[in-house]
Amino acid sequence: TKSAKEGQIKVSYDGYVQVKNVSKTLETLSAQEYILHNWSYAASRGTANQDAVEKYFGLGSKYGNHYADYANVKAHDYTDDVLRTALSHNHSVNVSGGTDKTKVIFTLGYVNDEGIKINSDYNRLNASFKIRQKLAKTLDLDVDFRYTESNLNGRENVTNGKGSNVSGAYRYRPIDNPLGGVSYSEVASGFSFGVANIDDKHNPVELINDITNKSYSRSLRGSAALSWEIIKGFVARSELSLTRSSSKSTYYENGYTNGDKRATLNRGMGDGLRSVSTLNYNFNIGKNNVFSALLGNEVLKSDSESSQITGRGYPSTFDYDTTMGLIHTATTSFSATNSYSVPARTVSFFGRLSYTFMDRYLFTGTFRADGSSKFAPDNRWGYFPAGAFAWRLSEEPFMNGTKDWLSNLKLRLSYGTSGSDNISSNLWRETWSSLGSGSNHTPINGELGSFYRPDGLLANSKLKWETTISRNFGIDFGFLNNRVNGSLEVYWNTTKDLLMAVPVDNTTGYSYQFQNFGKTSNRGIELSVNVDVINKGDFRFNVGAIYNYNRNKLDELPNADQYLYSSYWGSSSLVPTNDYMFVEGKAIGLVRGFISEGYYTVDDFNYTNGQYVLKEGVPDITKALTATYMHPYDLPAGQTAFPGAAKFRDVDESGTVDLDDATCLGEVMPRHTGSFQLNFNYKNFDLSTNFNWTAGGKVYNVAAMINASGQEFDGIGAQRASWVADAFKVYNVNAAGDLYAVTNPDELRALNANAKYHLPYHQSGITSSEWLENGSYLRLQTLTLGYTLPKNWLTKVHVDKIRLYLTATNLFTITGYSGIDPEVNANPTGQSGFYSDLRIFPTLNMDFGTYPRARTFTFGANITF
């Protein structure tokens, strides 16, 4: 926030123009590699599937023998079509001024931001007006008005088992003109569900263009505060702020993809009130005793209401505007619902007492009592004390001999508690939802009335405040007149009674219930250092660095020593279904799966009478892991493993790898993180860089796991990541141009002499150590070059200051991670798709459908008149 200064009127402008594009996309198969993979996979599914692929792409001696011709075809990567180079601009004007009694500041800002995804953009207009009026010598009035409105278009919220329309765009067929010369509709049955990979209507560009997704919001906040200095140092202050907000969102499908126009209209309104009253008394007793006392009260209130209209089946002539205007005319289905939130009320009382002795010993104690209507009456109040002590050791007389090299040395110690009620207001008692007048209800007396059902969460009247206990020991230091300065923090934070949605027995009729779940802790060290390396004349060189070591732990788990849960990205196509786990005493968000041992080689089998028979001592795998795993081999009865199949460790040494061999694969969050900055100044030029890094973390690469599985019929015709070309192969193309199964052991061994990955034909995604990759990285986050024009150039045009700058972000990343970006966190606090505020267990460091990170180039100006 900015406050007006006394004096002449000041006008300043800050603005920039920004160009951004995606920094990296997934490398995919060449056209011929794509053909061979899908031809082979279709053959493994059956002759009907193989014939459809051959007919569509013109393969084999039966359909034109065009396999070799695809070596000269350039693969079309549709990711390049759905992403673009985007232009954004941001402007802010500030006008301030006033007299000794009245100070005013006005700010107007505008942002227009194109998204790197086609048909997406965001714009925001904001204005604020602040005035401070001295009503009397001891009486001040502060008034603040803020208005904001924003529009968001093209939000990417369409996801499925393969990701989003953006992250999954690469899967669409990369060949624009298949050489078979037939329409996809002629072979659709042979592609089964995979027809979407070649269907013109599922072209990623068409999918995005088919959807109009807009949201609009605006808010107005006004506040007024009165401060009265009753006696010297004793100030009473009372502040009241009111907020009013409204929102509208629309979702429209044009029907190009599924032939059925659909629309959803949401409206919402909300009101908020905040009242804060404080008494603050600062006084001294003698020269060496300084006191500060504060007493206060805060009241928070919020209410909201919303409505939703959903329809399906509109005339083909209806466009977006017509459909939204006549949304109630849906012919296939229609529903309308209204909801009113349970009002949220919070009342707090707090106090603080600070005491400083001789400007060397500092004591602070605070206490809060918070009451929230989000909990049942017996649990509404939480009490949170805190205390801190600091010692300016460098000011002690016995440290006088260090003054020439020690500028500052301060020790700090603190202990405190804080509470959180970050949940909805309706979780402690049963609430009901309207089914809407348009739903398929049974009429009563020939009419549809109002129908209600319980909300989707099981009520819990025992909910109480989530509490965090913070413990900290710190050292602030400075050397050589503070040319070297920094701090060292040692911390231990514990959070107990976490408010989380926990799965419950389905026999209750519910899926989840919010509970106070367990206790977690974070222990760590943070070191920050700043060094003025050179500060001479016109040149200055400064270095800053931050290092953090953090270790999290699940200290307590209710009712069990471990708890399994799922990331849900693949639903039933994920093995094991629960791919994350809590283990008491271990880190949070452990990944669970199988230990990969590569793939079964030809040498793991005896080739007897045309059959690949597992050698003694080599464990088999069960179909419970792979589901359908297609291959062309003849196997003994009861055997699942074959050359090229994914191979996992038999942890329990039962002789067969099954679901009992799923184990903890380790933690994913990095323990070591940090950043460092290099800053240069020479005369009017400035150059700064900021690097971020992590070490020791893992990324759960679900995106790669999807590429390594067949996904049954859904996978036919899908493009894959380029590394799939190095996977095990069981088919080859002969001299006549026909595909054949390679069953001879010697030929199979030679064909796969350089294979790096297992045969990607199994139906389910199998979580294994193969998909936990090193997520360490070093990133140049920002690079800025600035120039401040000399003042003698500006005086004639009545300009006080002009600074021009160029900034680039995300210029490069050094990492061994094979995915698009190692800095991922899909669903860090839980799965989406249930309830908007459902805080389920965290699926940390999971790379699935991650929106691509942008690289930006910005030119800006800071001007003061």
Question: Which sequence ranges carry the predicted segments?
Answer:
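Membrane-proximal, glycine/serine-rich, low-complexity loop/turn segments characteristic
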Residues: 2-219, 225-227, 290-291, 422-441, ...
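Conserved small-residue
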Residues: 12-69, 308-312, 427, 515, ...
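Extracytoplasmic gating/loop element in the C-terminal half of outer-membrane beta-barrel translocons
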Residues: 51, 65-66, 79, 372, ...
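Extracellular/periplasmic, surface-exposed regions of secreted and cell-surface proteins
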Residues: 60, 86-89, 124, 130-139, ...
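Flexible, solvent-exposed loop segments that connect beta-strands
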Residues: 70-71, 258-260
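Short, glycine-rich nucleotide/cofactor-binding loops
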Residues: 214, 664-669
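Segments forming glycine/polar-rich beta-alpha architectures that bind adenosine-containing cofactors
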Residues: 652, 668, 686, 690
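Conserved SET/PR-domain catalytic core that frames the SAM/AdoMet-binding pocket
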Residues: 660, 670-684, 781-786, 790
